[in-house]
């Protein structure tokens, strides 16, 4: 679809004809075909064929933002903000109109897990459930020592910690599923976000899969079907 926000066509893949919509974000270097190529679409195919689930895989701007080491962090974030606005103001409304559904699930893993949590916390009226596997939730992992501009609003451990009661009520309407293996180097980020949700009174389902690394496709494929549709 042509995006006025991004200034070019944004590709996507759509699987299914009926049912709830599951939006699968790619990981850091992936494109719209990544989740199919690594078998994630296949593990929910029975739901797709039964008309219970539609899967939509949009392209990202990750290669032109976070993966481009020639860019300063402020420019990486500016480009990511364009992607967020594309999703919020163009893609999600179009999906709702085309599918006739207004209860989408947003899934992401690794960098996509951070994107899913950040997007849903900023636009909770657009998302009914978040599934974030093996994510990080402190933007400083991407920006290092820089934390200027709008960075605060893309760092869940910062902006959720300071949310007022009105915003807490809004994001509490979203179903939050945050998980990874307890052997993942990012496991502490999942613990931290889960504890933060608890302190703010935000219902969330948090899992640390015992005895496994968790930060890889076989684990994501194993656990995703548990949480859809």
List PLM regions with ranges:
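Non-catalytic cap/lid and distal C-terminal segments of serine-dependent acyl enzymes
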Residues: 1-229
């Amino acid at each position: 679809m042509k995006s006025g926000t991004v200034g070019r066509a944004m590709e996507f893949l759509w699987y299914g004809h009926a049912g709830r919509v599951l939006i699968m974000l790619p990981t850091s270097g992936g494109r719209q075909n990544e989740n199919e190529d690594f078998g994630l679409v296949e593990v929910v195919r029975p739901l797709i064929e039964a008309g219970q689930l539609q899967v939509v895989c949009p392209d990202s701007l990750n290669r032109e933002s976070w993966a481009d080491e020639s860019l300063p962090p402020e420019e990486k974030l500016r480009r990511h903000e364009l992607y967020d606005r594309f999703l919020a103001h163009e893609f999600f409304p179009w999906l709702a109109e085309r599918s006739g559904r207004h209860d989408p699930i947003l899934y992401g893993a690794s960098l996509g897990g951070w994107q899913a949590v950040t997007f849903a916390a900023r636009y909770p009226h657009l998302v009914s459930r978040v599934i974030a596997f093996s994510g990080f939730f402190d933007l400083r992992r991407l920006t290092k020592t820089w934390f200027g501009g709008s960075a605060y609003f893309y760092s869940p451990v910062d902006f959720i910690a300071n949310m007022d009661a009105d915003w807490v009520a809004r994001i509490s309407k979203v179903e939050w599923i945050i998980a990874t293996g307890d052997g993942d180097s990012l496991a502490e980020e999942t613990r931290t976000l889960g504890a933060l949700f608890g302190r703010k009174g935000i219902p969330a389902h948090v899992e640390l899969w015992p005895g496994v690394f968790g930060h890889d496709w076989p684990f994501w494929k194993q656990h995703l079907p548990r949480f859809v549709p």
